[in-house]
Protein backbone atom coordinates (compact mmCIF):
# COMPACT_ATOMS: atom_id res chain seq x y z
CA UNK A 1 0.00 0.00 0.00
CA UNK A 2 1.12 3.50 -0.74
CA UNK A 3 1.43 6.27 1.82
CA UNK A 4 -2.19 7.33 1.25
CA UNK A 5 -3.48 3.87 2.17
CA UNK A 6 -4.43 3.24 -1.45
CA UNK A 7 -2.84 0.45 -3.51
CA UNK A 8 0.15 1.44 -5.60
CA UNK A 9 0.08 1.27 -9.38
CA UNK A 10 2.12 -1.97 -9.27
CA UNK A 11 -0.29 -3.51 -6.76
CA UNK A 12 -3.22 -2.60 -8.99
CA UNK A 13 -1.50 -4.17 -12.01
CA UNK A 14 -0.82 -7.34 -10.04
CA UNK A 15 -4.46 -7.49 -8.95
CA UNK A 16 -5.61 -7.09 -12.56
CA UNK A 17 -3.25 -9.87 -13.62
CA UNK A 18 -5.06 -12.24 -11.24
CA UNK A 19 -8.51 -11.49 -12.69
CA UNK A 20 -9.66 -13.39 -15.74
CA UNK A 21 -11.82 -11.87 -18.45
CA UNK A 22 -14.32 -14.70 -17.97
CA UNK A 23 -14.61 -13.79 -14.28
CA UNK A 24 -15.51 -10.22 -15.16
CA UNK A 25 -18.03 -11.36 -17.78
CA UNK A 26 -19.68 -13.75 -15.32
CA UNK A 27 -20.04 -10.90 -12.83
CA UNK A 28 -21.40 -8.61 -15.54
CA UNK A 29 -23.94 -11.23 -16.67
CA UNK A 30 -25.00 -11.77 -13.07
CA UNK A 31 -25.47 -8.03 -12.57
CA UNK A 32 -27.36 -7.86 -15.88
CA UNK A 33 -29.74 -10.57 -14.68
CA UNK A 34 -30.32 -8.67 -11.43
CA UNK A 35 -31.06 -5.48 -13.34
CA UNK A 36 -33.35 -7.40 -15.67
CA UNK A 37 -35.35 -8.72 -12.73
CA UNK A 38 -35.63 -5.21 -11.36
CA UNK A 39 -36.90 -3.98 -14.74
CA UNK A 40 -39.77 -6.50 -14.76
CA UNK A 41 -40.88 -5.47 -11.27
CA UNK A 42 -43.96 -3.21 -11.10
CA UNK A 43 -41.96 -0.50 -9.27
CA UNK A 44 -39.29 -0.14 -11.94
CA UNK A 45 -40.89 -1.70 -15.02
CA UNK A 46 -39.00 -1.14 -18.25
CA UNK A 47 -39.68 -4.11 -20.50
CA UNK A 48 -37.31 -2.94 -23.24
CA UNK A 49 -34.45 -2.98 -20.72
CA UNK A 50 -35.54 -6.39 -19.41
CA UNK A 51 -35.59 -7.80 -22.94
CA UNK A 52 -32.13 -6.36 -23.58
CA UNK A 53 -30.88 -8.11 -20.44
CA UNK A 54 -32.38 -11.42 -21.61
CA UNK A 55 -30.82 -11.16 -25.06
CA UNK A 56 -27.40 -10.17 -23.71
CA UNK A 57 -27.35 -13.07 -21.28
CA UNK A 58 -28.45 -15.46 -24.04
CA UNK A 59 -25.68 -14.20 -26.33
CA UNK A 60 -22.95 -14.60 -23.71
CA UNK A 61 -23.88 -18.08 -22.46
CA UNK A 62 -22.13 -19.97 -25.30
CA UNK A 63 -19.16 -17.60 -25.14
CA UNK A 64 -18.69 -18.36 -21.44
CA UNK A 65 -19.07 -22.10 -22.04
CA UNK A 66 -16.48 -22.02 -24.86
CA UNK A 67 -14.23 -19.86 -22.68
CA UNK A 68 -13.96 -22.65 -20.13
CA UNK A 69 -16.22 -21.23 -17.43
CA UNK A 70 -17.33 -23.94 -15.01
CA UNK A 71 -20.41 -25.69 -16.41
CA UNK A 72 -22.31 -25.27 -13.13
CA UNK A 73 -21.82 -21.50 -13.33
CA UNK A 74 -23.06 -21.41 -16.93
CA UNK A 75 -26.09 -23.53 -15.97
CA UNK A 76 -26.87 -21.13 -13.11
CA UNK A 77 -26.75 -18.20 -15.53
CA UNK A 78 -28.97 -20.08 -17.99
CA UNK A 79 -31.45 -20.76 -15.20
CA UNK A 80 -31.41 -17.09 -14.20
CA UNK A 81 -32.12 -16.16 -17.82
CA UNK A 82 -34.97 -18.68 -18.04
CA UNK A 83 -36.49 -17.30 -14.84
CA UNK A 84 -36.08 -13.77 -16.16
CA UNK A 85 -37.83 -14.76 -19.39
CA UNK A 86 -40.76 -16.15 -17.38
CA UNK A 87 -40.93 -12.97 -15.30
CA UNK A 88 -40.77 -10.92 -18.50
CA UNK A 89 -43.65 -12.89 -20.05
CA UNK A 90 -45.71 -12.39 -16.90
CA UNK A 91 -44.97 -8.65 -16.90
CA UNK A 92 -45.96 -8.38 -20.57
CA UNK A 93 -49.26 -10.14 -19.89
CA UNK A 94 -49.90 -7.90 -16.87
CA UNK A 95 -49.31 -4.82 -18.99
CA UNK A 96 -51.76 -6.12 -21.62
CA UNK A 97 -54.52 -6.82 -19.07
CA UNK A 98 -56.85 -3.84 -18.58
CA UNK A 99 -56.53 -2.46 -15.05
CA UNK A 100 -60.19 -2.81 -14.13
CA UNK A 101 -60.41 -6.42 -15.40
CA UNK A 102 -60.97 -8.82 -12.47
CA UNK A 103 -59.43 -11.71 -14.45
CA UNK A 104 -55.98 -10.08 -14.40
Model-inferred region functions:
Residues 1-55, 72-104:
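N-terminal intrinsically disordered, cationic/polar leader segments
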Residues 53-66:
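Amphipathic alpha-helices of TPR/Sel1-like and other helical repeat/solenoid scaffolds
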Amino acid sequence: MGESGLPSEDELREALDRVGVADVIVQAVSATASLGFRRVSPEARDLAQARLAIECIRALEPVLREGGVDEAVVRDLEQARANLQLAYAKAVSEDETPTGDPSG
